[in-house]
Amino acid sequence: MIKPKAGTRLIAAEACLLLLNHGWAVYPKLSSILIYPSAFRVQREELQADGVVKSSEHHVLGESWGNGRVILSWDDVKNGATDFTDGHNVVLHEFAHQLDAESGTTNGAPPLRHNTYKSWSKVFTENFEDLRERSRRHQTTVMDTYGATNPAEFFAVATETFFEEPHQLYDRRPELYDELCHYYQLDPRNWHRKGATHAAGTLSE
């Protein structure tokens, strides 16, 4: 059961983590948040390698649209808040997409200071390609391999990992971690005692 006041406070609190040390407007494009009780189904059209467009059904935990609409599964919002050290948080993920969209397109490059674009592009491209390769090899990594889908998902998954598993991300992808520290203007390692988090399986990174 969704309790409206508690639910909106929880979502707002987690979404505002991404803005803590920034002087930005508070999600200027955000227009609405739709909450479903649990994971929901959507129809998506995908272009196949042979040029044929195929429609398929997907179960999703959340969505973020460039027009400012965010959709969330309440079950997964609660799960993310219950364990803030597992690297999975649908609120952080979808609101990272909202930040990304502020540049005019959702492509893994949110609005940045002019002198940081070159470094951001280099580090994110290298780490994205590395995650794609590890995903193809079915290797366990500190980041969820859903981030290998495209650059936009890479940024959203990197944001989840940055806030929830900062020590692990720093140990295995230090340059990526530093870029996220500069972007978000904070260091979540100060919030998490090292060794308190856990990782599923043995990481190959």
Give residue spans per PLM region.
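Short, basic and Ser/Thr-rich N-terminal targeting/leader segments
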Residues: 9, 27-29
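Short, structured protein-protein interaction patches enriched in aromatics and acidic/basic residues
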Residues: 3-14
